[in-house]
Swiss-Prot record:
Job description of the protein: D-galactose-specific lectin. Has Ca(2+) and Mn(2+)-independent hemagglutinating activity towards rabbit erythrocytes. Has an epithelium-dependent vasorelaxant effect in vitro.
Coiled coil location: none
Protein name as annotated: Seed lectin
Temperature dependence: Hemagglutinating activity stable up to 60 degrees Celsius but diminishes with higher temperatures and is absent at 100 degrees Celsius.
PANTHER family in the record: CONCANAVALIN A-LIKE LECTIN FAMILY PROTEIN, LECTIN
PTM description: Glycosylated.
Amino acid sequence: SEVVSFSFTKFNPNPKDIILQGDALVTSKGKLQLTKVEDGEPVDHSLGRALYVAPIHIWDDSTDRVASFATSFSFVVEAPDESKTADGIAFFLAPPDTQPQKNGGFLGLFNDSNKSIQTVAVEFDTFSNTWDPSARHIGINVNSIESQKYVKWGWEDGKVANVYISYQASTKTLTASLTYPSNATSYIVSANVDLKSALPEWVRVGFSATSGLSRDHVETHDVLDWSQTSTPAANSDYT
């Protein structure tokens, strides 16, 4: 089957191939700024998401085939007070008509009334909510805001983080790694995820981020570049 791939070394301020939701925008310098910044300072209660416009065929009912994919991106999270950060950024896969959910600790992906939203995410979580581990962490979330697997994350204020996420359909393994080139630290987490049971056949992929719900727990969430390749489940068009 044909490979679906795209690559952004930076983003277009008037993007045709990115769907912006909530507060997300692209700056004049080509940064994908997911949450609101005013006068150079991050704003609380902000939620922004960005989706690649073309849906991806993640599994195929007629053949039972499941797609493999790999995605890489760089992001920066910067906080005015590095002891008080919230709430985080995530890469996610969701139904093509996906809309922003609850802000704050739900990261724009989930909410407390509907626990079973079809969304698979890798979260880079900077605030410990009641359902979270007690430290900043990188988690793999399958249809729940509670991470199925996680690793503690030594977040670096204002430093570029390089992320690589891959899904191997044959072993149903979702793996995420984050590296800070500035100090050569890296973190890795992987989980067994059955995309066929977690998601519909077609999905959109993208990013979601939320700032904290109090004025002193805020941070920026900027994606600098993004590329992805996937070997789809079948040769067919989204209808």
